[in-house]
Amino acid sequence: MVFVVIDGLDASGKSTQALELSRFIRGQGKTVLLRFHPAEDNPFGAKAKQFLYARGKSAHFAAALFYMVDVIRSILLYSWRSYQYVIFVRYLMGTAYLPRPLDHLAYHFFAAVVPTSRHMFFLDVAPEVAEKRLLENRERLEMFENIRELGRTRLKALSLAVADDWTIVNADGSVAMVQQTIRKFLSGSSESK
């Protein structure tokens, strides 16, 4: 089984790239499990999503807590199933939304506990590009979807991605260019860390 993680800021193109990649892999006759987080098919993901539209520190922590439980639930329920590829959209980088130093503590705690892979992609998008995409495509914005939070979270997530040897992909470009980069790196080794 090849475990792939596609993570990044809001509006970095995570879902689009994961869908493109899963279509490509299925087109090669391989089986794929694709999970998005927060997932709305369970109470933890639904609560995480609900708190993302709330304001305040308690909503911030509640969103992070329910998000992490949602991801862990997916690992427990889906990672052991018989698929040739398992793709998770949003995984460890949700911890970057926590205040310092909790972001680093939570990231390293979860990275030590959950499965990791050589195929962990951080889609890096400039905050200005992300904000433009959000304003064009969303009717309602989540608590972190503003230029200030996008910039702050990007710096924290990039530092975590660099420190833990993620593949950082410039996601400011076209869908095709980003997909080509992901496929190029994915065609290398498929062993787990």
Where are these regions (language model features)?
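NTP-dependent small-molecule kinase module
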Residues: 22, 128-193
